[in-house]
Amino acid sequence: MSKLFSEYKLKDVTLKNRIVMSPMCMYSVENKDGIATDFHFAHYVSRAAGGTGLVILEATAVQEVGRISEFDLGLWNDEQVPALKRLVDGLHYHGAKAGIQLAHAGRKAVLPGEIVAPSAIPFDEKSAKPVELTKEAIKEVVADFKRAAYRAKEAGFDVIEIHAAHGYLIHQFLSPISNRREDNYGGPAGNRYKILSDIIKAVKEVWDGPIIVRVSATDYAHGGLQLEDHIPFAKWMKADGVELIDVSTGGLVNVEPPVFPGYQVPFADEIRRGAGIATGALGLITRGEQAEEILCNERADLIIIGRELLRNPYFAKEAAETLGETIEAPKQYSRAWK
């Protein structure tokens, strides 16, 4: 059997294969209320029908002020749970496990009114200047991640991913470019890591399932985080109980990264080897043979597919064919899926 189509365990959750749908914002909430719509149901469940092992929902805000836009999903109140439960049930029907990415946009929120950040430094010259979070407000953010995790459990999710990448709030704390604080949340790396550690520990108080963290392994900027900074972060995450690190890059400052097939895989490889923690690789992985090579050479443990799954919900089926595998079709499609 190919490695791509072997089972993989995240704590007590067994994935049927190692293909993961990357969380990707769809900006498709209709009433600015954070509630998932029929679009979200069709969008995510179709990828489960196509054979994806783990489907991770897009950035889901833990606070209303923490949305990237007014059209983002949310889990800051109980009214948002039922639509997500329906969606989770749909994913489970097709044999996929359900994940959700909990997030806070921080200074990258594009919303009316006040936005917040670790320091009063805007994302760029066109962005609003954020208000520096007080210690009390930081504790409330941590508490809201915990509340959102409890709601995720109520909705039936199998996996929680904490979004600490792409320039959003937790990443803003991690990077010295955006964190100029002089208290115990700023300065040395251990202080800058504190909010993420606090969030992981708070989530674990109400959630006994696997936790993934998405990071940006480089800021692509002078004075920012580089790969070597993420080795201690990853070791601390492992000690805090994180099962796997989803390794992306960039997003903290407004620069275009160099992009080519598999361009982020070396970062996943180095963090995996340097910190002794499982990683997920992503970034222009578009073919089954490419995914198989990454796994067979132990460069990562899971393959996280983004835009290729937007183009092709049946990526898993086609990857199986190229690797000489046969995967079970949804019974409704079996007459055509040979």
Swiss-Prot record:
Its cofactor is FMN. GO terms for biological process: response to toxic substance. One of its GO terms (molecular function) is NADP binding. One of its GO terms (cellular component) is peptidoglycan-based cell wall. Its EC number is 1.6.99.1. FMN binds at S22, P23, M24, C25, A59, Q101, R214, G306, R307. The keyword Cell wall biogenesis/degradation does not apply. The keyword Chloroplast does not apply. This is NADPH dehydrogenase. Substrate binds at Y27, H163, A164, A165, H166. InterPro entries: Aldolase_TIM (IPR013785), NADPH_DH_bac (IPR023663), OxRdtase_FMN_N (IPR001155), YqjM-like (IPR044152). It catalyses: A + NADPH + H(+) = AH2 + NADP(+). Keywords: Detoxification, Flavoprotein, FMN, NADP, Oxidoreductase. SUPFAM superfamilies: FMN-linked oxidoreductases (SSF51395). Catalyzes the reduction of the double bond of an array of alpha,beta-unsaturated aldehydes and ketones. It also reduces the nitro group of nitroester and nitroaromatic compounds. It could have a role in detoxification processes.
